[in-house]
Amino acid sequence: MQRAIYVRPVGIFPAPVGEDGENVWSGLPLTGQPLRFATIEIVEREGVRIARRLASVSDAFERDWGRYTLEASSLMEAITAPRARLAGLALDVPRIMGIVNVTPDSFSDGGRFSSAQVAVDHALRLAEEGADILDIGGESTRPGAETVPVEEELARVMPVIEGLRPRTQMLISIDTRKADVMRRAAAAGADILNDVSALTHDPQSLSVAAETGLPVILMHAQGDPKTMNESPRYSDVVLDVFDFLESRIDACVAAGIPKAKLVADPGIGFGKHLHHNVAVMGNLALYHGLGVPILLGASRKKLIDHISDVPLPKDRVPGSLAAALAGVAQGVQIVRVHDVAATRQALAVWRAIAHNTNKV
């Protein structure tokens, strides 16, 4: 379903640590983080017609938005409301999800961690480097990837989860599109479900996700991984992604998954060409209107090569850090990365400078 109005906070700025004021004149708080905004972009959409205008927060509250008033007000409430903890993890500061690919064909590190013990050791190393969440995946969903049979995926990820759970209290996320893998991973101690299809690939995944009671990360992707980047089409990629994620959030809530347990991922690189990815990256703050935390996964992805001519994924760390910082500056709560230590250092320096404090 297509929305009629969207609201994007712009001019986001850091709030000094300890500031308590929350009036429109000093800006409004962004999702409970030490970030504020005093200007919004109002986007009106009717079919193919899209109109955009900027307004100060104070002006927006003083004027009549006509038939959009109620809808815009609900979006503003979603943008300013603090986010619930994710499996016990507070989201008042940016959090790091470390990637553990137990696959032979991942685009970045395929085959490096394909044995269970090597993957467990790698995951524990990411935890030591500062990861808040460990994301375990046994099926590559890179462009062109083939579907992995469920038994093979289980054989890859279950020994890793079972090997990790007794050795760490770190949050464990299972990156899968399959209901059987979700169910087995949850029983083995996984804390979060991360589905690149937003619970659409497997007809049973929505009900199984609800049964587990675990938080769910819903990602936008256009098409199947094997063909998704051949010819993606959008009316407006930024708004279309919003509409898709909002529809999946509604479907989850209808299935019995509380909205407070959902996270939205706009799906950088999934059914998107460079101009699509850049547009989404530049408008991440719009997705706060969904009323759930935002996860950004741009680490080592092809868009970095397209922008800066870096063919090898392992050489894309600087571009990955730039993408992560661009995200957290727009209020993204979670960054999914390969290079945890470098990301942690970059975020610590950014926070210290942005908030004029060394309490990172």
Predicted feature locations:
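N-terminal accessory interaction module
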Residues: M1-A87
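Active-site-adjacent loop and "lid" segments of alpha/beta metabolic enzymes
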Residues: M1-P34, L91, F107-H122, T141-L164, ...
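Glycine-rich, aromatic-flanked loop segments that form ligand/cofactor-binding clefts
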Residues: R83, L89-M97
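Catalytic domains of carbohydrate-active enzymes, especially glycoside hydrolases
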Residues: D121-G137, Q330
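Short acidic capping loops at alpha-helix termini that bridge into adjacent secondary structure
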Residues: P258-K261
